[in-house]
Structures are given as structure tokens and as C-alpha cells.
Amino acid sequence: MSDRLGKRQLLDIVLQAVDQSGWRALTLNAQHPFRLRVHSAEERGFDVLVYIWNCTHGGGAARAANEYRIQLTGVVPSADPSISTLLLGWHAGYGVFVAFDITKHSGQASASPSIQVTEETLSQAHASAFARYQRQTGEIAIAFRPEFFVEYALSAKTLHQGGAAARDLGLLNDLDSVTDARLESISNTARQLVVSQITRKYRAYDFRSRVLGAYGHHCAFCGVQLNLVDAAHIIPVADDSSTDETANGIALCKLHHAAFDRNLLSVDEDYKIEISGSESEKLRAEGRLDGISAFRKNLKTAILLPHDRRDYPARTYIAKARQVRKWMG
């Protein structure tokens, strides 16, 4: 089966990537190059212009086995200083984007215009989320998984820096090894911010993937899926004792996540779900208790538990969380 996608399919891949990044997109122009408005919650967000082609080997005995490329056919890429302009390839087999510096290829046209990248770069991004690669021309190519699409779009100019920036930005090639101390050692403010943001996103996405996977993407309080489920920390992130272990996570739908954070709901050390009487009385005093019966009816008696006992919420974390959150019951 061919891995080559049509432009409509590539647009769908981009839109899905924005969604996986935790943002939303309005399609302002569905003709290639695509123009999108990327936004979060009620904020207006920012516009991006996306040039994208399939990233393929291209075949031919003369081509190195590990050389992949995009061919700039159909339209000549052009950098637009008024908008974030992305020059991308999509490799369906590895499920990653590869991005090139638009300023190096603006106006590039020839009988067979192409831009190359190594298969190792694509493979590394698939396995480790991000990969920086210096092409023979000196240009820095960036490969990344879809959940980092918005982070790339926001920081493309910095990410494509070479020279003295290589040491700092090279940390992105091994995000598992990036410690807070290594982040603090980056003296350039812009690069430190970019690497810090991507590292935090990597850690959060890893936690989310593990927790939602453990619960089968079901809310532990009501059982709903519908892609409306978050990975919540049992001990809040703000507390020094919080961890990103799966055992400190619980899958909750948007409604029950908010109720959990507001201390209207809790879970005890026997995994039973509790509604706070004190918080309910506060709501009653404010005249905002309507719907509590239906709210209560939709709750399970005890939380849904992961299939693997190793992923169960740790009872010590539940006890600590109730202390930190000052649960009154």
C-alpha cells in the first residue's frame, strides 16, 4: 500500500496534529499551501501557512538507502514575513513530520526541486519525539512527532538555528535525559525557553499517554470516553511531593476533572468516590446546587481501575493528596 497521501489527507494530518498538541485550528484556506488559525480555548491564537509534501525515499539505484526527501512540486514555497510559514514533509511510515528552514528554500524551483533528510532522523523522532539533523548545506532540519506540531510552529525560527546554538538545542535529541539543571545551564534566554517548553510538553504528554492508556481512555468516575478525558495528577503538580508516575495519575472527564480540582469530588483509599458535603453546602448557600442529583447519579460507587494492578492509584498518594487538597468530606 502506498504511503503517499493527497493534499486533502495531508491537511487532515496537520489538523489532527494541532489537536494532538492540545490546540484547535480553523482552516482559513484549504488549498495548498494551507492557511490555518491555531488557537487555544478562547484566545485568538496565531495564523500559520503550511507547505507540506510526502517524505519518501524516491527510489533509484543512485540514491542512498537512508536518504529520504520531499519534492517541491505544484507550488513554489515562499516565505511570508507577516505569518509563520512552515515547510514540512510527512512520513506516514514513521508517523512524523520533518521541517526545513523556509528562509533557505523560499523561491526554490528547478526541474526536480527536492530537500533531503536521513532515515535515521525520522526514526529518532519516531522513538524520541524530536530530532535535529544538520544537512550537508549546513541547514538544520527538525523531525518531530505530531503532538509537538504547535511547539514547532511557535518556535521554528529558534529551532533552526545552527552554530553556537547547536549545543543548547541538541538537548532535544534526548529529551529523557534533560534535567532541570541542564535547562538552567542554557545561557541564551530564547533557547532556554524553547527547550524548557518542549521538555515540559514531552513529560506531560508521556504522563498523559500512560495514564489514559491505563484506563482505556475512560473516565474513572463515570466511564465516559468520547475523547473528553484528561490525565489528572492525584497529588497536584504544584506540590513538591507530586510525581509523574502512572500511580499518581487518574483518568477523568472534563467535568469530573474540574470537580476533582475544586474539591467537590475525591476518592478514598478504598477507591470509593466521595462528594464533599462541605463544598455542596457552599454551593447551596450560593444558590448554585442545581443539577447535583443528576451529577451524583452519573458517578460510579468506586472508580474504574486499570487492568494492570501496577497502574492502580497508590493509596499513599491518595492519602497525601487529600491532605494537600485539604479534603473536608
Where are these regions (language model features)?
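A broadly used, surface-exposed interaction patch
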Residues: R44-V76, D80-I83
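Short, charged surface segments at domain edges that flank catalytic/cofactor-binding sites
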Residues: V178-H218, V237-A247
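N-terminal "first-domain core" detector
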Residues: M1-E43
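Elongated alpha-helical scaffolds
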Residues: S78-I102
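A detector for short metal-coordination/catalytic motifs
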Residues: Y202-D206, A214, V224-L228, I234-G329
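Polybasic, proline/glycine-rich intrinsically disordered low-complexity segments
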Residues: A17, A25-T27, V96-L172
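A short, charged
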Residues: S82-I83, S123-E151, T301-G329
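Short, charged/polar surface micro-motifs in flexible loops or helix N-caps
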Residues: C55-G58, A92-G95, H257-A259
